[in-house]
């Protein structure tokens, strides 16, 4: 079968723009997410909060679980592969998954190489903390980006930091002349043509979602107002007191992110949010966002 072009894969990712993608660990959770208005679900055995709490090596989910979730919903299904583990990605593609997340939430399989995403028919999403990381992933074939944030914490501070870093660097690029763009591209180890494209268009060449620590409707709206194209919500929904209601509220806040009255209304009576973690109290070797390069 012919491989889809990168442009086609970017177009598929564009279809998710403005939406919410939710982590789910059972077919029932996937149905709740779809009914709440999620544009896609991420099939996982453990949400990031449980991966963080339980430790050990986190790998690709069991294909049986992924297929059960795929059969339960009509919206696209994503699944995670370890950084650099191209065979996990091959397995996910064989299962008929719609998108693959080469994810720092799982334990990296290769500490020197990311997956060559151009070799696959289906789109990849990758995390980034800044513009350089994002453009390096795009050069490898990523069709969609997301902030890394700090998954499983219920603390949005790192996602905000990463989103602000990306968009402030884009604004800075627009003030540079050609010589400065060459130097900048060399310094961030990204292709000059991609850097020039971003400087001219004032935006990333692919959609960029927020992820990591989003727990409330206001969190989702905050990232949307900062300029992201949509949000991933992991532990924040199904680790809360009323997952179905919180899921609907986060979808509404993502859609109406510039309307505080609506965000206020949907935020009422949601029950207890997930218990958060202060980033500064996480041991350095347990931080996930630093995985990848």
Curated annotation (Swiss-Prot):
The keyword Plastid does not apply. It holds the Pfam family SOR_SNZ. This is Pyridoxal 5'-phosphate synthase subunit PdxS. The active site is at 80 (schiff-base intermediate with d-ribose 5-phosphate). Belongs to the PdxS/SNZ family. Its EC number is 4.3.3.6. D-glyceraldehyde 3-phosphate binds at residue 164. In the presence of PdxT, forms a dodecamer of heterodimers. It comes from the Bacteria. Keywords: Lyase, Pyridoxal phosphate, Schiff base. InterPro entries: Aldolase_TIM, PdxS/SNZ, PdxS/SNZ_N, RibuloseP-bd_barrel. The keyword Lyase applies. GO terms for molecular function: pyridoxal 5'-phosphate synthase (glutamine hydrolysing) activity. D-ribose 5-phosphate binds at residues 23, 152, 213, 234-235. HAMAP family: PdxS (MF_01824). It comes from Roseiflexus castenholzii (strain DSM 13941 / HLO8). Pathway: Cofactor biosynthesis; pyridoxal 5'-phosphate biosynthesis. One of its GO terms (biological process) is pyridoxal phosphate biosynthetic process.
């Amino acid at each position: 079968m012919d491989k889809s072009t990168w442009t086609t894969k970017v177009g598929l990712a564009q279809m998710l723009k403005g939406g919410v993608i939710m982590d789910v660990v059972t077919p029932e959770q996937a149905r709740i997410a779809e009914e709440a208005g999620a544009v896609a679900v991420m099939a996982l055995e453990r949400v990031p909060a449980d991966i963080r709490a339980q430790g050990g090596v986190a790998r690709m989910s069991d294909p049986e679980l992924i297929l059960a979730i795929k059969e339960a919903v009509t919206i696209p299904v994503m699944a995670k592969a370890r950084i650099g583990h191209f065979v996990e990605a091959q397995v996910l593609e064989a299962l008929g998954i719609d998108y693959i997340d080469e994810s720092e939430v799982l334990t990296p399989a290769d500490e020197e190489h990311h997956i060559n995403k151009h070799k696959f028919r289906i789109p990849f999403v990758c995390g980034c903390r800044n513009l350089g990381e994002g453009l390096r992933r795009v050069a490898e074939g990523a069709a969609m980006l997301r902030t890394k944030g700090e998954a499983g914490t219920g603390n949005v501070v790192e996602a905000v930091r990463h989103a602000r870093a990306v968009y402030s660097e884009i604004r800075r690029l627009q003030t540079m002349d050609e010589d400065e763009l060459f130097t900048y591209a060399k310094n961030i180890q990204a292709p000059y043509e991609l850097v020039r494209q971003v400087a001219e268009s004032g935006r990333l060449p692919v959609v960029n979602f927020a992820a990591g620590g989003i727990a409330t409707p206001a969190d989702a709206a905050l990232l949307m107002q900062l300029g992201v194209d949509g949000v991933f919500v992991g532990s924040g929904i199904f680790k809360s007191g009323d997952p179905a209601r919180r899921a609907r509220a986060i979808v509404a806040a993502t859609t109406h992110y510039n309307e505080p009255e609506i965000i206020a209304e949907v935020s009422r009576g949601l029950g207890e949010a997930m218990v958060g973690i202060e980033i500064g109290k996480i041991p350095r070797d347990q931080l996930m966002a630093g995985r990848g390069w």
